[in-house]
Every structure is written in C-alpha cells, then in structure tokens.
Amino acid sequence: MAAAETGRRPHIPVLLRPLLAAVAPVSGVWLDGTFGAGGYARGLLEAGADRVIGVDRDPLALEMAQDWAGAYGDRLRLVAGTFSQLDVHAGEPLDGVVLDLGVSSMQLDQADRGFSFQKDGPLDMRMSQQGESAADLVNEASEETLADILYHYGEERASRRIARAIVEARAAGPITRTLHLAEIVARCLPRPKPGQMHPATRSFQAIRIAVNAEFSELVEGLEAAERALKPGGRLAVVTFHSLEDRIVKRFLQLRSGGEGQGNRYAPETRAEAARFTLPLRRAISPDEAELADNPRARSARLRVGVRTDAPAGPVDPQVLGMPLIPKKGRR
C-alpha cells in the first residue's frame, strides 16, 4: 500500500524509519518504484541520497507531485511507468531500490478510482487508468475464472459462491459501481463481528490484483531490481498481504542461496551463486506507535536484500509461489 497524502496532512509512509535504518547509510542514486505521494522519495533524499528516480504507473500521482517536486531540482526525476521496467527507467546502475506494494492510500481515499468497498464510485481499480477495468472483468469473465481469481488472488474460501452471485447479479444488468459489488459479496458471507474486516475485503483485493497484473509485475520488478543494483546496493520491499510477501520472501531466500522449495509442487531448484545477502533475520512489522497513527499499516512487512556481484538472471514465477490462473475466456 504505497504511502500517500490525504489532503489534510502529509501521510508518513509505512515503515519509513525502520526502512531507512535497515538500508543505511543512504547515498548515491536510488529508485522509488512506487512513488505515490513521494513519501519514500523524500525520506531517501533527506537521509542522504544524491538523487532519487520516482517511478509510478498512476499519472495522477505524478501530476500531484509537481506541486513540490521542483524544490529538489535535479535531485528528483519523475518517470511514468511500471516498476517491472525499473532498470530501463533508471538507465544507470542503482545504489538502492524501494518498492511499496499494493494500492495507495490516495487511491483508496478517492472514490472515483473505484478501489474502495466503503465508498460508492465507478468500478474501475486501474492504477494506470488504462486497459481493462474491474467492471470489464466482473461483467465479462466466466464464472470459473472469477472463482479462480477470488480464490487464488484473495484467498477467499467462498470464492465459488461469490462468483455465482456475481454472475446471477450481472444477468439483470451490468455491475458498474463499487458498492453494488460490495453488497453482492457481503450477501454471500456471514455478517462480520465488531472489529472484523469487511466481507468484501478479499474479493476487492483479488479483483484489483487481477486488473493490474500485480503478481507478474512484482516478479518482473524483483528481477529488474536485481539487474539494476550495484554490488552492495539495497533492495527494500514493503508488502501488505501474505501472497505478495510470500513471493518477496521466497525470491530473497532463493537469491541469497537459501535452499528448499516454495511448495512441494514447485519444480526443484539447484543451488546458484548468491545474488543477495540478507541483513535482516526476519521481516520487520510496524510497532504499536505506528499502528496507532496508521491502522492501515497493520499487515505491512518490510524485507531487505543487499546485492552481491553475482550475475543477474531470470527466475521461475512458479518457484516463488506466484499463483497462476489459466485464461478461460469470457462468459
């Protein structure tokens, strides 16, 4: 969940202080692959980075940054694009890469972006504002494909029940609003107890991941970071749910010479030269003070790797435990 600003006061990025501590000393050229409202980029510049390249696929994020980015002069360069191509966007070896995954607070808080199940808006969910929207997917995908997306990308146990309800609802007319979809999902699940998450949480996560191809983007981004980082360069990744954290954890384990497989069905892997070392024994989570200030940070996890001089190479997404959903066409 990339950090953002709400318009009332600056929102401090999740895990910023522990991230800066974990990658210290900060110097040279860094790339923030999920620029958002620029919180990490500013943190890196203030911590000592000579220059920061800010990459974001959301044109609105880069547009909003124009109000303050000029104050940093040529120390901050903004690029419209995806972090899966971060090595191309950088155009030079990097001393560090930061990735803050998922949807931003800014995107969640703007109802017209269609990410929120608590605010009525068009069923969109496109980070780049281009390509297939959530409404396209929900109204055109087959029931089987919808069920697979909900189960594999949202870990939703009631995936088949929800997919059936969506298909039945769209038969009466297109599903085009966020609250309409949230209501359909909620009717399929027990009423949550106080303090429990909204019943549409997992379904909205799954559809968003599918619309934005977030898992393939993540795997390609990790490979791109490996190619771009200098020996000694730092890779810091903040995740917000178990599926993406599993991919990052497995990538760093494999690339640091760790053994074992992501799951028993994954192909066997042979030992290779370590491309990263791991300065942290385990992932870092927000402390109580940060959670009190930002409850959305509860599921955040920070993982860090330090690049070695071993040559970069491709990685098999299946070995990383990336869910693969076969294309089954439209209804």
UniProtKB/Swiss-Prot annotation:
SUPFAM superfamilies: Putative methyltransferase TM0872, insert domain (SSF81799), S-adenosyl-L-methionine-dependent methyltransferases (SSF53335). It holds the Pfam family Methyltransf_5. Its EC number is 2.1.1.199. Keywords: Cytoplasm, Methyltransferase, rRNA processing, S-adenosyl-L-methionine, Transferase. It is found in: Cytoplasm. S-adenosyl-L-methionine binds at residues 38-40, 56, 83, 100, 107. Transmembrane segments: none annotated. Residues 308-331 are annotated as: Disordered. One of its GO terms (biological process) is rRNA base methylation. Disulfide bonds: none annotated. Its main location: cytoplasm. It catalyses: cytidine(1402) in 16S rRNA + S-adenosyl-L-methionine = N(4)-methylcytidine(1402) in 16S rRNA + S-adenosyl-L-homocysteine + H(+). GO terms for molecular function: rRNA (cytosine-N4-)-methyltransferase activity. GO terms for cellular component: cytoplasm. Specifically methylates the N4 position of cytidine in position 1402 (C1402) of 16S rRNA. Belongs to the methyltransferase superfamily. RsmH family. This is Ribosomal RNA small subunit methyltransferase H. It comes from Cereibacter sphaeroides (strain ATCC 17025 / ATH 2.4.3).
